[in-house]
Amino acid sequence: MVEPELTGPDAPATPPAPPSPASPDAAWWGQPTGAPPASGSRWRRALVAVVALVAAVALVAHLLPPPLESGPDRTSAASAGTVTVLAGSPTSIDPARHNDLGSAQYVSQLYETLTAVDPGLNIRPALAASWQVSGNGTRVTFTLRPNLEFSDGSPLTASDVVHSWRRLFTPGSPSPLASLIGDVEGARELLSGQSTDPSTLGVSAPDATTVVVDMVQGGGNLPAIVSSAPFAVVPPSAGDAEIMPAPGAMVTSGAYTLASASADTWTLQANPHYWAGTPAVGTVKMLLTLNGQSPVDEFSAGAMDVTPISFTDAGWLAYDRQLGPSLREDPSLSVTYYGFETRTGPFADVRVRQAFAAAIDWRRLAALEDPLNSVPATGMVPAGMPGQPTGDFVPAFDVAKAKSLLAQAGYPDGQGLPTITFIGGGGGDSDAAIVAMLKANLGVTVQYQTMDFNAYQQRLATNPPDIWSLSWVADYPGPNDFLGVLLGSGSTANQGGWSNAAFDAAVAQGSSAADPAAALAAYTQAEQIVADQVPVVPVSYGRSWSLVRAGLLGAAQNGTGILRLAGLQWSGQ
């Protein structure tokens, strides 16, 4: 999922994964066990998601001083049974239409998926009680829990799952994240336009509690993939049109319903028909904006219980006697990368891409970032992701090689090269440094501009610039979410339109491999192909921070940036 840079007073953050609760099921979902460190979700993206450099942050553990006194008590944020969270503004609350983390925060509370990911990155049952993968990985069978209901008490059945997933492939307006299940039979044909009938998708419901998914390959990954918000279940009344906010009237499948909505605050109410039981926190106030106020000041005043914060605030809060104990570092599976438009223009020539990549000192750019904000990337798959390929796949800085490659492509000293457009999402000094290095090392003048998030998404989808930047956060725990999903031929998230048969074969081998060592070897090969062909250049892995009210349990994160409200509970409640 795309993620934006977090700057300014409304910026957000994230925490470390605590031990998984003893119970493999409802204890994690609705009844927190023990008292893991409370924490917020990776909210820097919770403000809606794409664009330039990740501004999330993390403080190295040994720099954190021991608590000097207990953190601020919960004062005015709410009464018992209520939690107030800074969540940002969603661009969509429709599972089939959203494309950013900020929206996923809302979608995930209103609509439930078949599976979910716990703080230890384990796949847990949600609407599905169990699942089976065939020996060859080409069929996955999910068995739903009995007697599931939507928030209005109507039955939730397997046919609703089929209906919800088919909506991802609505002709003319497919989900931006539909490629996540590109290995399901019929999905690629629907995405390429070879088919316009969503009923050809390989998903069926032979009875009310069974969902059968036929795969081309990679069935072993499907239970993890469908934990992501796009695969949440919507009611039968949801047609092809986008689901819009309807306070008091929405039928949901998740832990909460939308009770009210204003320009500043959305209020969520616990769903008594939720499969894991009515959530312990009955009311959640989701703040869309602080209207210019500082999240630290608002938290200190008791106006919020969970808020993301900027890395600059995290640096001094670690030593603050009052707020320091409430500071949490959230796990963050995210990467910031720069990309090239490879379908047309000069960057369709691999030599031009290689020249530009070699003319920029990527490692120096990453090293100049504040370590509380990000760490240098070694490849597209972020640190902490299970199965991350080992090695350094970032292009080496070599000006002589860059000049030679550009000359071979027919542009000696940049002569004859058409105007290069570079649109960022607020990369600031890093973007400026890239423009300066290209001028100094290749003699190339780059036209640079920034755009707001919505306009930027539209531009990438309709008329991509020559160079662009994005941050991507994991949809599920798996390397393919950063390789095949972002760079596979025909993927809806492949912004630069790159296509490479050897890369596609490598990620297909990795996603279908039953042996972890074989999967690692295949994904390592895929990373090397990216490094050689340079459709994108990974720069940094983001880090995140939040403040969490003392006594709030169950707010641990899993690295995908979603705070599971159903698992929250006040100590002693």
Task: State the predicted function of each range.
Residues 34-38, 366, 444-461, 470, ...:
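Extracytoplasmic/peripheral linker and loop segments enriched in polar/acidic and small residues
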Residues 348-436, 440, 525, 572:
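Append "and occasionally in soluble cytosolic enzymes with long acidic Gly/Pro-rich linkers
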Residues 87-107, 127-128, 154, 176, ...:
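A structural "hinge/loop" feature
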Residues 3, 86-135, 166, 248-252:
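N-terminal lobe/hinge region of extracytoplasmic solute-binding protein
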Residues 143, 160, 169, 173-235:
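Surface-exposed binding/hinge segments that line
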Residues 194, 209, 215-279, 283, ...:
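Gly/Pro-rich hinge or "lid" segments in bacterial periplasmic/extracellular proteins
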Residues 407-474, 516:
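Ligand/substrate-recognition segments at binding pockets and active sites
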Residues 259-269, 285-344:
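Extracellular/periplasmic solute-recognition and catalytic clefts
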